[in-house]
Structure formats: C-alpha cells, structure tokens
C-alpha cells in the first residue's frame, strides 16, 4: 500500500534500481545491478568481519562525536540525551528509540520540539530480542540510537524523504563506504501510535540505520493498514531516523561480534573468569568462532525460530556436528550476553530504576536475574557490581554513573542476596509443581513456567533442571525471556474514564480555575452556567477539584440568601462540577444567576500544608537516600499524608530522623513557594524530567511549583511560603511492595496533634511502669528481660507438667487389642500443649492418644505410635472424624494430627467416637 512512497528522485538520479530479494521477498534499492538479495542477515552473511567497512576504526565516543558533528555542520542542533526510563511517558517504561523522547506531545503537534531540525545520540533499551543477545553477534539490550529528526507541518516543511536519504548517503560516503555494498530496503514501520514508510540501510549483511518517514497516526476509522493496525494521515509529518552507534563501531572494526568491538577488555576478563580464555587461543577454536561469527545472523531467536534448527544451519555451513558447535559456542555466547546485560543494568540503575516486581523495576530485575543465572552457569564468582564498575570506567561521558555507583553497588548486592534466597526455596516450589504434572503425564506448560518466574522469581533453566530430576518435561521456548520482556514492557492501558455527564457538559466552556491566580482568596462571585440534579457549573471557581492525590475543597454556595453546602468538586474535560449536599428537593438556583462561593478555610489550609510538605519530604528523602528516589504515589488527607517512594531497602530509623530534620529545616527557612506556567519543552530543558514525580500532566504549558530545592509539575494547592506549613512529623514507614517504601507524615496542626498523641502514650507508659519518661528505655529493657526469663520458666514448667501428665495417662490408658489408648480432655490447654503431650506419647510405640481441650472453642490432637500405625490406626483419620462432631475439621499425618471445632459441649462425644474408631481399626493380634 505504501509502494508509491519509495519512488523517489534520490534513487532515480543516483543510479539505483529497485529489486525484490530472492530469499525474503522484500523490495530494496541498490546501485549494484548484479545483486539479487536485500543484503540483510540472514539473506546475506556478515561479510564485513575481518574486512572493516569504513576507512578508519572508531570507538564509541569517537563515532558518536563524528555523527553529531556531521549533522551539526548541516544545520541540525545537538540536544542532550534523555534518561532510559521514560519518565515523561505513561504508556511505556523504557526509552526504546530516540523518537520516544518526543512522543506524544511533540509528535502530535501539541508542543514544539526542543530544536528543529535536531540531532541526538539517545541510549535506548529494548528487551524484545533478549534471547538473541550473545547469539546473533549483533543484538543488544542497551544501545545508543544516533538520530536526526525534522518535525514538519503542512505549512512549514523542514525536509522530508529526499533530503533524508541524501544525508544518509553523504554520511556513508564520508566514511568511505563502497556505494555498491549499500542497499536501501523497503519496510513499513509502526510504533508508539504512529507509522509510515521506512527504509532500512544495509551494508555487508548489517543493518546500520533505519529511516522512518512518520506521517500516519492510529485511527480505528483509518484507510491505511500496517501490521494489522489502521492509520490515517497526520497534520504534521516527521523524519525519524535511527543510526546504530554500536553497529557503526562494529562495522568500522570488523570484529567477530559487536561485543568484541565494543567491550574487548570486559569480554576478555569474563572469558578468563569463565575458564575459556585458553580455548580462544586454540587455532581450531579460533577458526570455528570466526566462521560462526560470519553466519551468526542466522541466530535470531524469535517466536517462529527454533534455536536448535538455527544452530543446525550454522553447524552445517561450518561442517561440524551441532552438539560440538553448541558446546563451543554456548559458554562464549553467555559471556557476550553477560557483557551486554551488565551495561544495560548500568544505564537502568544509573538512571534511577529500582529493581522490583512491577513496571520498569520488573524489567531491571528480569535482566539482572538472567545475568546472575548465566554467571552461575559459567561459575563466574565475582560480584555483579565489579562488572558494572568496568563499564562505568569505560563511559567517562556519563559522570553521573560514577557519582551514583555506591547506590548502584548497594542495589546489586541486595539483589544478589534475594536471588540466592530464591534459588534456595525455588527447588521445593518446582518439585511440588513438577509432582503435580507427573501425575497427569504432562509437561510443565509455558503458563506455569511464566507463573513460577513472575510470582517466585524462579528462572526457567532451574525449573527445567529440577523437573528433569523427577522425570517431568518443561515447555521452555527458546525466546522465553523475550516473551516475558514483551509482556511487561508496556504500561497497563488505563481504562478511559467514563464521563457520565458528557452529553450535558459538551457545550459548556471550560471552568476558569482562579485558585491558581489568587491562592489565598477563598470567597468569590461567579455566574451559574448550568444546574442539574445536585450539581452546579460556574463560569469560574476557587474550589479545587479532586486530583493529583489531593481531595476536593468543600465549602458553601449562597444563592438568593439560601446557603448550599458544597461537599464534592470534580472536573470532567475541563468543566468543574460542584456537588451540593443532597437538598431533598430541586435546587433553587437558576442559570445565569450570580452566586457567592466560599471555600472552607480550615480544610483548604490543612490540605495545602500537607501538599506542600509532600514536596519537601520528597526532596529531603532524595538528599538522604539518593538520587534514585522517585515518587511512586502520594495521597493527602486532613490528618496526615502518605508518600510512596521507589527504594531498594527499608528506610532505617536514623535515615528517617535525617529526612525529618532536613524537611523541618526547609520549613524554618521560610522559603517562598514559587509557581509559574511554562512551555513544556522549556520546563524539561531547564529542570529535567524530575518534574514528573507526581505524573505527566497534559498540555503545551505546565504548571511548575518550586518548594525549596524541589521542582515539579503540579496542579495542587500549596502554601505561599514553607514557614506556613508548620512542623512536619514522620509518623511511620512501611514497605508496601517490593521496591516501594511508604512514608506517612503529618504537617502543621495535624503534626502537633500527632506529637501530642505520642507524648500521651509516653506519659501513660511512664505511669504504668512508675518511672519518669526519660527512664522508660532502661525500664522497658529490664522488664522485657524479666518477661523473657519468666516465659522460659513457664515453658519449662509446661514441659514438666506434660511429662507428668504422660506418666499418669499411660497408667490410666485403656487396653485395645494390645494397644494402649488414651482418651482425655485436658482443660485449658492450647494446641501447642496438646501437641507436646501427644508427641511425648509417640515415644511409646503401642500408644494411641486422643486429646481434646476447650481452649478457644475446641482443640483436638491425636497421635499413633509405630506399632499402632502398623495395626491400621491413622491419627489424621481420627482427628478428621472427631472434629466433625464438634463442628469443625482437621487432619494431618498418620502419626500426628490436629483439628478442632466450635462446640465444647460435644468434646466427650468426640473422644468416644475416636475410641470406637480405634477399636474398629486396630489389629486383633496382641
């Protein structure tokens, strides 16, 4: 459908011919009339290995600078890179391409670009090819996309397809690339809600660049279909190019793999630690590795590609068995993958991602644990942080990583401990799961394998090993990690909020929010635009509508001397609804009427204090805990607020004290709270993406709030200066999920009340112990020590009592077919006491004990000695039947079981029933 898009003067005027690849069927453009394939792997092998493509070698820094300078000299503005965690997006977690920096606001035309045209070298992370990393010789999880972008409008074109191709060809010519070796492959592109024609730039089997001409947007009613989605034309159209920095370096060096080109020192170090460096010096091994490298393009593990079949292709081409090739290549490929993954982790953690079980943190842990698993396979016994440190030493252009290394190191050590714990308990979990499938004769399915990984962190390789010991197979696809990465790569699509009043409100203008202009004003006049049910719409308002974790204002509306209480305020597509406390009759308010509104001052100020304090506590936490701290959620109430922070371990009491001290210092400095509306692009350039701690607001302009050193895009109400907040008191902290710590605090009068409450508890405790408050710690320690001693003595006496009871019970036991049967109600005994007695009685092999107690309902315990069990007595069956009589249930093992119920009046009936069952089950032999 896009075929006409490629009929360009650039191709016609520069000696290109359009051909169709004889292997994959794709159309491409070439200057070589003899060429019949598209040039891309696997249609063509890598022919640049050992034969570099460019006239000189480049390292990463040199290549990046060459590219950016090339485009700067041709009218492009160089801009700084964005983080690899997409803080400005709510639809994806990671920056997957340079164009992601500008989606959705710039690409949609809502916001101007930071420069036009521009050039950038953007670090990216993609995990959809995770299983090909290390194997194909070219795949990376973390790569830099060098790019130049032009943002065109129908009335203002910067440049389009012709000039983009001219620039690409000029760049390759400047690097002395043989023009006959270059192919431009036609391939439609789609991503991030946009699409368009695309040209892939191939040289000697390697895709060096992708030139996308984005002029389509997703549209359910669109008439253009690409990859199963329908699209329509955009008002603007964008040049979206991506040149692979690492691939350019590889092509310049002709190394066996991209990993050898980028990280030769780290690869050699890991080869040595894995004990395979000596093999690389062997001429036969070196020859096999070289041949494998040229054919590694086959090793693209995808949903349709089977790893063993791909390996067979390469083995056949080399002329050796697949088993021998696998034995040689798998350790080497794992070293390559570890090298790649650790650089990926350097960017992830360096840019502030905290490993966890959700969102970007899940993806970081996915890469991290896959790395640890491969290190375990190769018996590489160094901390993960040592390899990350090697990468940081090679990246002086990222000084923030070195500055943040202590935190990165701490995170990695913590994650290694968690991984080792998972491995220890994982074996039992797998054995249980495998036993279930062994009974059914089935393999452990992919769904269960995914569940084991997602819920318990158990790697599929481990599941396969343990299941094999039990004789159970596992459905373990070669692209398992790619599947997992793809499942968790995108944010969950938010359900579109249904506007129940859409029809009613669609013709009304947006309500003017005057509380932004005059934050201290609480009384105002407004014109009524609409009234329905118990809702009122005004032309302007000082009532804050609920949003951003802040509850709505309340107050009153006065109309014709009637006072109406406003109990809720909500906003729907810019129109604010004021909800009146149910009047029980139709509101006597009419359209066009002038009303007086009054906001409840106490609630407004309390919430403003807590909202402003949230900014301060967040900033203090970042200063104390590290720059990785990111707001994961916040909610303000009248009596307290809570702030959720991304953090990799529990916040210590000392850290809490430091955070509280810093927060109150900011309050006492009485700094002015500054608010201003700024163009989004300008705000991002000035303040960075920390602006979006509380979420990403829409619009070309965003409201910036500066509280002390904290600067955020925020739409809430705030104090005009920090001194108005009053004291800030942290009430408690807790871990609400892996990787997220919650701080609860109070501000202003609420903080004073909280401190008074704590003081009352202190005074009451002092009175109880008859000591002054300052002596409480010593007294509590003393009483606690005495309590522990008494508890031990109590346990000793209980055991002694149990033994004496055992002797008496044995003397009172009934004889049943050579067995001694004890049936007794032990008043007031809990389950543990009954269990101790029953366990003691187990030492006598011909004893059956049936014990019951009226403690908290009914407790029942039964035990059967070895001889009793041989005679057919089963304690589990006895407890099950006895528990039914007292209105409960229970069970256990043949030797010892526990149960109970709710009806203590039937205890004797239960004991009698137990005795009958013993008589029925017991052997007749003495």
Swiss-Prot record:
GO cellular component: cytoplasm
Swiss-Prot/TrEMBL GO biological process terms: alanyl-tRNA aminoacylation
Reactions the enzyme catalyzes: tRNA(Ala) + L-alanine + ATP = L-alanyl-tRNA(Ala) + AMP + diphosphate
Main localization, broad class: cytoplasm
Enzyme class: ligase
Cofactor: Zn(2+)
Binding residues for Zn(2+): 611, 615, 714, 718
E.C. number: 6.1.1.7
InterPro entries: aa-tRNA-synth_II/BPL/LPL (IPR045864), Ala-tRNA-lgiase_IIc (IPR002318), Ala-tRNA-ligase_IIc_anticod-bd (IPR018162), Ala-tRNA-synth_IIc_core (IPR018165), Ala-tRNA-synth_IIc_N (IPR018164), Ala-tRNA_lgiase_arc (IPR022429), Ala-tRNA_ligase (IPR050058), DHHA1_dom (IPR003156)
GO MF terms, alphabetically ordered: alanine-tRNA ligase activity; aminoacyl-tRNA deacylase activity; ATP binding; tRNA binding; zinc ion binding
Keyword set, alphabetical order: Aminoacyl-tRNA synthetase, ATP-binding, Cytoplasm, Ligase, Metal-binding, Nucleotide-binding, Protein biosynthesis, RNA-binding, tRNA-binding, Zinc
Top-rank taxon, per record: Archaea
Pfam assignment, any one: DHHA1
Localization in the cell: Cytoplasm
Chain segments annotated as transmembrane: none
Cofactor: binding details: Binds 1 zinc ion per subunit.
UniProt domain comment: Consists of three domains; the N-terminal catalytic domain, the editing domain and the C-terminal C-Ala domain. The editing domain removes incorrectly charged amino acids, while the C-Ala domain, along with tRNA(Ala), serves as a bridge to cooperatively bring together the editing and aminoacylation centers thus stimulating deacylation of misacylated tRNAs.
NCBIfam families: A-tRNA_syn_arch, alaS
Family: Belongs to the class-II aminoacyl-tRNA synthetase family.
Record function comment: Catalyzes the attachment of alanine to tRNA(Ala) in a two-step reaction: alanine is first activated by ATP to form Ala-AMP and then transferred to the acceptor end of tRNA(Ala). Also edits incorrectly charged Ser-tRNA(Ala) and Gly-tRNA(Ala) via its editing domain.
Protein name: Alanine--tRNA ligase
Lineage: Archaea, Methanobacteriati, Methanobacteriota, Stenosarchaea group, Methanomicrobia
Gene: alaS
């Amino acid at each position: 459908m896009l075929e006409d898009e490629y009929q360009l003067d650039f191709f016609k005027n520069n000696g290109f011919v359009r051909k169709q690849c004889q292997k994959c069927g794709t159309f491409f453009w070439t200057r070589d009339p003899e060429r019949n394939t598209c040039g891309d792997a696997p249609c063509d092998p890598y022919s640049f290995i050992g034969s570099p493509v460019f006239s000189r070698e480049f390292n990463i820094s040199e290549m990046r600078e060459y590219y950016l300078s090339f485009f700067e000299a041709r009218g492009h503005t160089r801009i700084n890179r964005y983080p690899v965690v997409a803080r400005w997006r709510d639809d994806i977690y990671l920056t997957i391409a340079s164009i992601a920096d500008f989606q959705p606001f710039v690409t949609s035309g809502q916001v101007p670009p930071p420069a036009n045209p521009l050039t950038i070298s953007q670090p990216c992370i993609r995990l959809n090819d995770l299983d090909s990393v290390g194997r194909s010789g070219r795949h990376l999880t973390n790569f830099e996309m060098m790019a130049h972008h032009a943002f065109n409008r129908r009335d203002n074109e910067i440049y389009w397809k012709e000039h983009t191709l001219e620039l690409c060809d000029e760049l390759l010519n400047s690097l002395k690339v043989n023009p006959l070796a270059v192919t431009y492959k036609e391939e439609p592109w789609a991503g991030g809600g946009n699409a368009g024609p695309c040209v892939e730039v191939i040289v000697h089997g390697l895709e060096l660049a992708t030139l996308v001409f984005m002029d389509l947007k997703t549209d359910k009613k669109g008439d253009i279909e690409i990859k199963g989605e329908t699209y329509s034309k955009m008002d603007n159209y964008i040049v979206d190019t991506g040149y692979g920095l690492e691939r350019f370096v590889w092509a310049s060096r002709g190394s066996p793999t991209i990993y050898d080109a980028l990280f030769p020192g780290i690869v050699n170090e890991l080869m040595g630690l894995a004990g395979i460096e000596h093999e690389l010096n062997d001429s036969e091994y070196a020859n096999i590795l070289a041949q494998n490298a040229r054919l590694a393009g086959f090793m693209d593990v995808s949903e349709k590609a089977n790893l063993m079949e791909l390996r067979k292709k390469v083995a056949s081409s080399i002329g050796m068995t697949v088993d021998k090739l696998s034995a040689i290549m798998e350790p080497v490929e794992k070293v390559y993958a570890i090298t790649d993954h650790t650089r990926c982790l350097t960017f992830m953690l360096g840019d502030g991602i905290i490993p966890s079980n959700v969102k970007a943190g899940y993806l970081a842990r996915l890469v991290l644990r896959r790395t640890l698993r491969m290190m375990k396979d190769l018996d590489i016994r160094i901390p993960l942080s040592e390899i990350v440190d090697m990468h940081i030493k090679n990246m002086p252009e990222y000084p923030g990583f070195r500055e943040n290394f202590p935190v990165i190191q701490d995170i990695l050590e913590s994650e290694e401990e968690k991984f080792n714990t998972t491995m220890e308990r994982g074996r039992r979990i797998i054995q249980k799961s495998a036993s279930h499938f062994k009974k059914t004769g089935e393999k452990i399915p992919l769904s269960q394998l995914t569940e084991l990984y997602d819920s318990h962190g158990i790697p599929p390789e481990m599941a396969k090993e343990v299941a094999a010991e039990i004789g159970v197979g596992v459905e373990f696809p070669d692209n398992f990690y790619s599947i997992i990465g793809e499942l968790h790569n995108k944010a969950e699509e938010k359900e579109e909020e249904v506007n129940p009043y859409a029809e009613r409100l669609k013709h009304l203008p947006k309500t003017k929010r005057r509380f932004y202009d005059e934050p201290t004003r609480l009384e105002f006049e407004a014109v009524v635009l609409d009234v329905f049910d118990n809702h009122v719409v005004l032309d302007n308002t000082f009532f804050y509508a609920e949003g951003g974790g802040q509850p709505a204002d309340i107050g009153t509306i006065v109309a014709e001397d009637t006072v109406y209480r406003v109990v809720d305020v909500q906003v729907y597509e810019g129109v604010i609804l004021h909800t009146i406390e149910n009047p029980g009759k139709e509101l006597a308010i009419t359209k066009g009427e002038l009303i007086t509104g009054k906001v409840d001052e106490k609630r407004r100020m309390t919430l403003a204090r807590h909202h402003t304090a949230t900014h301060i506590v967040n900033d203090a936490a970042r200063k104390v805990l590290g720059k990785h701290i990111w707001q994961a959620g916040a909610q303000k109430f009248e009596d307290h607020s809570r702030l959720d922070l991304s953090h990799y371990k529990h916040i210590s009491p000392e850290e809490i004290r430091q955070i509280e001290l810093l927060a109150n210092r900011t309050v006492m400095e009485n700094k002015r709270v500054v608010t201003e509306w700024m163009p989004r692009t300008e705000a991002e350039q000035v303040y960075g993406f920390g602006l979006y701690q509380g979420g990403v607001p829409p619009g070309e302009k965003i409201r910036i709030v500066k509280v002390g050193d904290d600067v955020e895009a925020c739409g809430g109400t705030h104090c005009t200066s920090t001194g108005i907040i009053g004291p800030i008191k942290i009430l408690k902290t807790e871990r609400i999920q892996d990787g997220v710590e919650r701080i609860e605090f109070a501000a202003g009068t609420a903080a004073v009340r909280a401190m008074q409450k704590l003081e009352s508890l202190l005074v009451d405790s002092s009175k109880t112990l008859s000591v002054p408050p300052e002596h409480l710690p010593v007294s509590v320690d003393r009483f606690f020590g005495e309590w522990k001693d008494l508890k031990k003595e109590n346990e000793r006496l209980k055991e002694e009592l149990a033994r004496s009871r055992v002797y008496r019970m044995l003397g009172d036991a009934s004889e049943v077919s050579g067995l001694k049967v004890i049936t007794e109600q032990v008043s007031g005994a809990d389950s543990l006491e009954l269990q101790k007695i029953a366990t003691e009685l187990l030492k006598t092999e011909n004893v059956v004990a049936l014990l019951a107690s009226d403690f908290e309902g009914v407790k029942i315990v039964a035990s059967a000695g070895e001889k009793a069990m041989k005679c057919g007595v089963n304690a589990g069956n006895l407890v099950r039947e006895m528990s039914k009589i007292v209105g409960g249930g229970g069970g256990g093992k043949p030797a010892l079981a526990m149960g109970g119920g709710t009806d203590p009046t039937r205890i004797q009936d239960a004991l009698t029933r137990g005795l009958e069952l013993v008589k029925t089950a017991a052997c007749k032999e003495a």
